Amino acid sequence: MESQSSEEWQLEEGIPQVDDPFIQQYMRGRSSLILEEQKQRHDCNLTKALPPTAARACNIVSKIRDQELHQLSSSLGLDDARFPEAMSLDWDSVQKTKLWRIVKAMPKGSLLHAPLHAMINADFLIDVAFTTPGMCVSATQPLISQCDLDEKAFAFQYSSAASKDVADRPTVWSSAYEPSSLVPLRKAASSFPYGGETGFREWLRSRCIPQPGRASYHNRAMPLVNSLLSYEPILRACLRHVFARLRSDGIRYVEFRTTFTFPYRREGEDIPEQGHSDWCHVFQEELARFQGTLEGQGFYGARIIWACPRSLSKKDIVENMKDCILAKYDYPDTICGFDMIVDKDDQNSLTDLVPILFWFRKECSAEGLDISFCFHAGESLRTGGDQGLFDAILLGARRICGGLTLSQHPLLVELIKEKKILIECSPLSDEMHGLTDGIQTHPLPVLLSRGVSVSLGTDAPGLLGEPIDLTRQFWQAVQGIDSMGLTGLAMMVENSIRWSCYQDQPSAEWLSDLREGILGEGTKASRLQEWYADFEKFCQWVTEEFAETEGEEQD
């Protein structure tokens, strides 16, 4: 008996054929359903509006991504190298890839999530501290045990008495040390019990960078670094360093978060200033100086989101808020937002702080000031770690930093879309902090698929003390998320520009600018127009530089 062909067998059994009208109707319905689902994605409209050159560039980037992933998988003997752990990546090798070159060259708009203490290279900061005259150190207790060295408070402060004879004064490593007394930096370093100055530098560096398996980076690093940034010469040097690095990464505007819990001192002054208005003055001076340089051309500016630790007492929080209002009054162009940050496990929740936050808003209104809320919320996956999302939305936050648990709340997802709230997301940093296992377990792809507006930021330096720039965040997103391409990155850059606080705006004007986007007439519209012009030039470069990839067949 002759074997039947597949088609003959199917006809004999009465199996419908693909060309049958009702099967074709099913396929049309299927295609419509897929298209309808894709309309929910964050980059749907941008994908449809891409000019031909940009569409070609997107196709080339996707091919290069797939080729390099295939090569990496083969070399590592893996089925899929899409999800390497950030801490184990050979970044030197990554930076030699075509995909890295492309992402590095991409214009990146604004950086909206940027803790100032995490933006500074650890080795640079330590060198500046050692070369600044009069620097002293102090601790709240003697630092004797390894636990003391790892966790206890340690800070810097200028003192004109640092050069005087203090040979008999116990250092912080001695049980005889008097808590909070100042010890000259070089004396403390040379007497460090684990290797003198070299060991001290290594220890100090370890306090300034994330450590594998430990999620307490900000608790350890933020107070230490901010104590250094509270002295004028070091603040100026670090701002120059950070502005230059950001501009070289394709960033044209930044909003730093920083805390103001240490008294600020001018150069050579033992007595601190009242408040932090002079800090803001230095910030504006250094920004203007950088913008006047050749490398600062095209840098739109920088502003500050005043970050208040939730661990402070409510009375101290109110005093911190008063300091913020005064600084905003004196230097309105510097302060653009207010955040309540998580710095310890035992702290006030946003719910606990609602009365104080209403008081803050009333005081701002009375002074004619506009300081928008940009809250950390939903950044912990532990039970109860998502409750701040409800408060952030109800309090009218324009942006939410974190949002790791947002995807678990369908109603909040819809509210955030309706109220046009941006989520500031830092997948690589979240992995560094131990909040997620990697890009494959990060909620970013889910948020994007549901049409939530997201921008990428950076929340921690790398393990070697170098700041994690946006290029790394972009590279991880495009190589680690299957549905992410150049269009997805471009949409997140557009979001970063649309949600930038270039200038103070009342709510109605803010929402109007968000709705109008590139078609508006204000600052944001012009910045979007400039970015799209830069993006088209970038896409043209991609099509010319990697033209051979366009005609290659996928393996």
Predicted regions and their residues:
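Metal-cofactor-binding active-site regions of metalloenzymes
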Residues: E2-L422, S426-D555
